[in-house]
Regions:
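Short, ordered beta-strand-loop transition motifs
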Residues: 1, 74-76
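Basic, often amphipathic N-terminal segments
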Residues: 1-67, 86-144, 157-168
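Residues that line or immediately flank small-molecule/substrate-binding pockets and catalytic motifs
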Residues: 41-42, 77, 152
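Short acidic/glycine-enriched loop/turn segments that link adjacent beta-strands
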Residues: 76-78, 157
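Charge-rich, low-complexity N-terminal segments
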Residues: 80-85
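Short beta-strand segments and strand-loop junctions that repeat across beta-rich extracellular domains
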Residues: 145-155
Length: 168
């Protein structure tokens, strides 16, 4: 069977570099197999790749880059992430979800809580310590969203299928 497809929102170059740096510093090295990312869909069927690519291309051609903000530092048990607030990005995701309705697994049928994970699969006290440390200097700020990407999930590293940039 071919690998499932993951859809992510791409960050602008400076934000991507910043998030990747934090992820390299705090994610267990043996588990850090992908760059920092904002997941929109976790598991789309590869048999529908032509339709998925076509819909992603249409979305980015029809809309400017959505506004987004880093709004909080989240403690998720054994993980730490930055909350991403973007009603515009969620609206685009909803449009895509409606178009792909019959293809979505239960996890992808629900509206996601957008975030960027920078630490995962650590003991809760380690996550708590990083969360407290990041909260000390955290200030909400804008986050650049530049496009959408599709990847094959390969039991660890992802394989890039393609990137589509928002107009303007």
């Amino acid at each position: 069977m071919t690998a499932p497809i993951i859809i992510t929102a791409d960050m602008g170059k400076a934000d991507q570099a910043w998030a990747n740096g934090l992820r390299r510093a705090h994610f267990p090295a043996e588990r850090n197999r992908v760059d920092a990312h904002i997941t929109l869909f976790h598991h789309l069927p590869p048999s529908h790749l032509p339709e998925i690519k076509s819909r992603l291309a249409a979305l980015v051609q029809n809309y400017p880059a959505p506004a987004a903000d880093l709004s909080d530092v989240m403690l998720l048990g054994k993980a730490v992430a930055f909350r991403v607030d973007s009603p515009e990005l969620l609206s685009l995701r909803d449009e895509l979800a409606d178009a792909l309705r019959g293809l979505l697994i239960p996890q992808d049928q629900a509206t996601p809580k957008l975030h960027i994970t920078i630490q995962n699969k650590v003991e809760p006290p380690v996550a708590k310590a990083l969360h407290a440390h990041l909260l000390e200097s955290f200030r909400p700020r804008p986050l650049a969203i530049s496009g959408l990407s599709a990847h094959y999930y390969r039991d660890g590293p992802w394989e890039l299928i393609g990137r589509w940039s928002f107009r303007g």
